[in-house]
Amino acid sequence: MKGWFGLNTTAMTERVLIVLHQEQSTPGRVGYSLRQRGYELDIRRPRFGDPLPKTMADHAGAVIFGGPQSANDPDDFIKAEIDWIGVPLRDQKPYLGICLGAQMLARHMGQRVFTHPEGKAEVGYYPVRPTAAGRAICDWPDHQYQWHREGFDLPNGCELIAEGDIFQTQAFRAGTGYAIQFHPEVTHAMMCRWTTRGAGRMELPGTKQRHEHFADRPVYDHGIRAWLAEFLDHWLALGQRQLAAAE
């Protein structure tokens, strides 16, 4: 596999669709990593009226990020995004759902999204354990950064690739689609913003306090960076294999 700065020259003109849910949101480390691999980011915000493509012919993959919304919200753009996930799955292009985007994939696959029965949330660094299928993809760090109070069960026909303690299903695969409940995209600047603007979330049961986030970051972030690099190489290769098979 390519290293952190490995560039795929065949991807120099390819685009990855990036779906964000707030005006000031960024794709963080995921966006940086994709650019380092030669991909152009096509950033869209359906919440503010940006359309989503009817096919993936002009995109190498798609990433739907998180946000303060719930996959259970009645907003039209939430329902539209959940339905739209069928486009990359149909076209056999890589799809990655992060947090809200993962919950949307679970909903698309017919699974429910729910709050913890004891009102617990995961905000901070938490243990995540890969399954045998997850270990076959890449090496995993001991912890991942989390920021959510809803979770999901494994949809029928999907493959569990990571699990946790508070919310058991942490990551799964559905064809060329991946759902991850955690946030490998978070940079130090993003953590500063989230823990300031979202301070109220750290009052929920089970969450880590702000000082713990910053104390844990130097302990776990190196492993998360390495995981993201290896995972993205695997994820992008899904689309390249489909393209080679079609030719």
Task: Name these PLM-found stretches.
Residues Y32-L96:
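Flexible gly/pro-rich beta->alpha loop and the following alpha-helix that scaffold active-site loops
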Residues M12-L17:
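Extreme N-terminal starter segment of soluble prokaryotic enzymes
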